[in-house]
UniProtKB/Swiss-Prot annotation:
<keyword id="KW-0805">Transcription regulation</keyword>
<comment type="similarity">
    <text>Belongs to the NanR family.</text>
</comment>
<dbReference type="InterPro" id="IPR036388">
    <property type="entry name" value="WH-like_DNA-bd_sf"/>
</dbReference>
<dbReference type="GO" id="GO:0045892">
    <property type="term" value="P:negative regulation of DNA-templated transcription"/>
</dbReference>
<dbReference type="GO" id="GO:0003700">
    <property type="term" value="F:DNA-binding transcription factor activity"/>
</dbReference>
<dbReference type="InterPro" id="IPR000524">
    <property type="entry name" value="Tscrpt_reg_HTH_GntR"/>
</dbReference>
<dbReference type="InterPro" id="IPR023730">
    <property type="entry name" value="Tscrpt_reg_NanR"/>
</dbReference>
<dbReference type="InterPro" id="IPR008920">
    <property type="entry name" value="TF_FadR/GntR_C"/>
</dbReference>
<feature type="domain" description="HTH gntR-type">
    <location>
        <begin position="27"/>
        <end position="95"/>
    </location>
</feature>
<dbReference type="InterPro" id="IPR011711">
    <property type="entry name" value="GntR_C"/>
</dbReference>
<feature type="DNA-binding region" description="H-T-H motif">
    <location>
        <begin position="55"/>
        <end position="74"/>
    </location>
</feature>
<dbReference type="Pfam" id="PF07729">
    <property type="entry name" value="FCD"/>
</dbReference>
<comment type="function">
    <text>Transcriptional repressor that controls expression of the genes required for the catabolism of sialic acids.</text>
</comment>
<keyword id="KW-0678">Repressor</keyword>
<dbReference type="InterPro" id="IPR036390">
    <property type="entry name" value="WH_DNA-bd_sf"/>
</dbReference>
<dbReference type="Pfam" id="PF00392">
    <property type="entry name" value="GntR"/>
</dbReference>
<protein>
    <recommendedName>
        <fullName>HTH-type transcriptional repressor NanR</fullName>
    </recommendedName>
</protein>
Amino acid sequence: MSAFDHSSDDTQETIGNSLRRRPLARKKLSEMVEEELEQMIRRGEFGEGGQLPSERELMAFFNVGRPSVREALAALKRKGLVQINNGERARVSRPSADTIISELSGLAKDFLSAPGGIAHFEQLRLFFESSLVRYAAENATDEQISLLSKALEINGQSLDDNAQFIRSDVDFHRVLAEIPGNPIFMATHVALLDWLIAARPKVSEQELHHHNNVSFQEHIAIFNAIRDRDPDEADRALQTHLKSVSATWRALGKSKKSAK
């Protein structure tokens, strides 16, 4: 029997009861404005780089108040469909890989805070970067290897400055992520590291000094394998490094909890 078959009173009663139990939510005015503007942008009524009408014009066009227009524009900005600068009308833009990944940020933080969440993200990073170093060993240009060498040099110069070491550590891995030339890889990698670093416990400079030295030596091993065009060794060095990093932060987190 079709869900739209009206021949059964029982079916009608069941559907009626179901609808009474789950009333449809009404859309906010801002959501309706957002949807209409999004459709207009996607249809090309407002071209990329062009400006949308002013807030006052949008208020008159949709017959809504300023808060509804501003909420709609803010939602479109989150989707990467418009850029908003103070004092200027919203300008149509094209969603980037960064926009796509940033939309996942809230969900990612929820996953990270769940039991086993950090371990799952660490595994994701391991799988992801394993492919990156293999690709780098097989395909990196001499110029890209030179950039990686420079990042490694800065990393080694930062051993005694923890904040600088973290930045140079991230930069070393960022250069790896740039080698394939895929913007989605870059956006994913940046977000993944941001999420994992934010989830790490706060520890003293002294505790991290030994860890920094170990990480730097592991970076050297990764670089050498890529320079030597050895994807298997690059993968082994990367796996050793990331597993070491994960184990170190787990140990630091446990010691901090036990000290409380």
